[in-house]
């Protein structure tokens, strides 16, 4: 494991514990021996108020490579979501998560989670990752929002 990656992740965890957006969750997983695994984060993103996503809490895994922050983490909804920019595997398609697009080492976990939260209600139709969600979003917005509301209800924490 890279000392640079672990150092950066420890720094980010410390900053996150002091101040993070309401409702967002980001915690490292635990190794079999009980120690923290900073390279594997369990996250949760609440749907924004006033959107069809409201009420849902969507679980996401954030996996960091040894060369983080030179390369972005892989972000994957577990289970996968119905969304134009989420691959059927659950992996999020977002330009700031792609090394050859908009990733920069200065981008933080907080910025990534806020970016994904924003993406939920504002899909990028120029970069679709899921054919069914993309097609319904483009052709029948009412049906799309109905499905999103049902999904938010399904993933409601209460």
Swiss-Prot record:
Biological-process GO terms, alphabetical? cell division; chromosome segregation; protein sumoylation
Recorded GO MF terms? ATP binding; transferase activity
Where mainly found?
Answer: nucleus
Lineage: superkingdom: Eukaryota
EC code(s) of this entry: 2.3.2.-
Q: Is Cell wall biogenesis/degradation among the key words of this record?
A: no
Write down the position(s) of the site called Substrate binding: 100-101
Q: What enzyme class is recorded for this protein?
A: transferase
Q: Which UniProt keywords apply?
A: ATP-binding, Cell cycle, Cell division, Chromosome partition, Mitosis, Nucleotide-binding, Nucleus, Transferase, Ubl conjugation pathway
Sequence segments annotated as region (Interaction with sumo1): 13-18
Q: Where is this site: Interaction with ranbp2?
A: 4, 25, 57
| Catalytic site | 93 (glycyl thioester intermediate)
What SUPFAM superfamilies does the annotation carry? UBC-like
Keyword Nucleus part of the UniProt annotation = yes
Q: Where is the UBC core domain?
A: 4-157
Question: Belongs to which family?
Answer: Belongs to the ubiquitin-conjugating enzyme family.
What binding partners and quaternary form does the record give?
Forms a tight complex with RANGAP1 and RANBP2.
* Job of this protein: Accepts the ubiquitin-like proteins SUMO1, SUMO2 and SUMO3 from the UBLE1A-UBLE1B E1 complex and catalyzes their covalent attachment to other proteins with the help of an E3 ligase such as RANBP2 or CBX4. Essential for nuclear architecture and chromosome segregation.
User: What name is this protein filed under?
Assistant: SUMO-conjugating enzyme UBC9
């Amino acid at each position: 494991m890279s000392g640079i990656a672990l150092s950066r992740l420890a720094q980010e965890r410390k900053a996150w514990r002091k101040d993070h957006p309401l409702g967002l969750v980001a915690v490292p997983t635990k190794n079999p021996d009980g120690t923290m695994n900073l390279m594997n984060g369990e996250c949760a993103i609440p749907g924004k108020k006033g959107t069809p996503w409201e009420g849902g809490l969507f679980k996401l895994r954030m996996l960091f490579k040894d060369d983080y922050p030179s390369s972005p983490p892989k972000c994957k909804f577990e289970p996968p979501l119905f969304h134009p920019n989420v691959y059927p595997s659950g992996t999020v398609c977002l330009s700031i998560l792609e090394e050859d697009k908009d990733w920069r080492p200065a981008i933080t976990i907080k910025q990534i989670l806020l970016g994904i939260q924003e993406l939920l209600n504002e899909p990028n139709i120029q970069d679709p990752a899921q054919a069914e969600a993309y097609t319904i979003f483009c052709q029948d917005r009412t049906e799309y929002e109905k499905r999103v509301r049902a999904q938010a209800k399904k993933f409601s924490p209460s």
